UniProtKB/Swiss-Prot annotation:
The gene is lgt. This is Phosphatidylglycerol--prolipoprotein diacylglyceryl transferase. Keywords: Cell inner membrane, Cell membrane, Membrane, Transferase, Transmembrane, Transmembrane helix. Belongs to the Lgt family. It comes from Actinobacillus pleuropneumoniae serotype 5b (strain L20). It is a multi-pass membrane protein. Catalyzes the transfer of the diacylglyceryl group from phosphatidylglycerol to the sulfhydryl group of the N-terminal cysteine of a prolipoprotein, the first step in the formation of mature lipoproteins. HAMAP family: Lgt (MF_01147). Pathway: Protein modification; lipoprotein biosynthesis (diacylglyceryl transfer). GO terms for molecular function: phosphatidylglycerol-prolipoprotein diacylglyceryl transferase activity. It comes from the Bacteria.
Amino acid sequence: MNEQFIQFPQIDPIIFSIGPIALRWYGLMYLIGFGFAYWLGMRRAKNSNGVWTTEQVDQLIYTCFWGVILGGRIGDVFFYNFDRLLQDPMFLFRIWEGGMSFHGGLIGVIVAMIWVSFRQKRSFWNTADFIAPLIPFGLGMGRIGNFINDELWGRITDVPWAVLFPSGGYLPRHPSQLYEFFLEGVVLFFILNWFIKKPRPAGSVAGLFLIGYSVFRFLVEYVRDIDPNVNTVDDLITRGQLLSLPMIIGGLAIMIWAYSRKKA
């Protein structure tokens, strides 16, 4: 029966290793994502008529890099794997094993943006609107890393493109990581970069990002397998959806505020 479905490609999560040092696909995907964000940010700085300098973008990307890494890891552990942390405190530091929370990473990036805005004496919303269109590609690369790591797969299904994941018991499952790659990494990227082609009120780009990501994440959660270690609310809403709802509301509030200020 399972012959009709797609076999998970056997990809070694480690690309190569030299002694105790190993380069993993998961880490490489993040580096590619940040590399692309850096390149795109520099390109936008050169076309910003002096609003941004390449030095300022360099500082912003570097600071946000650490915000994502630290916030993403801490968020994953505290939001989704707190019980495991209590059993094995060193789990927090084994980032190479995978496990990065977008919501934790977002908190880390917000802290980084506040610090950079203060240092550069610019509006927080100016910083947020600049960084938002740089994020989706990196999100998509992270989902590719999840796919290669054979983690965060979807629920059991009989769709023709179902994948037989080894850690999922070789049962046909939704490749939910690839759904998120397409929606969060590709579709959202084009939406935001189309949106910024015209002048927009301060905060509107960041607001649209929050709405777009959260709606896509909320929808994919319906086919993403529920982590048995993470509670749901009466089996009606997942932890990921619960964390996404405030972001949808917040994004809408920011958009309304941004456009109401413009009219005023």
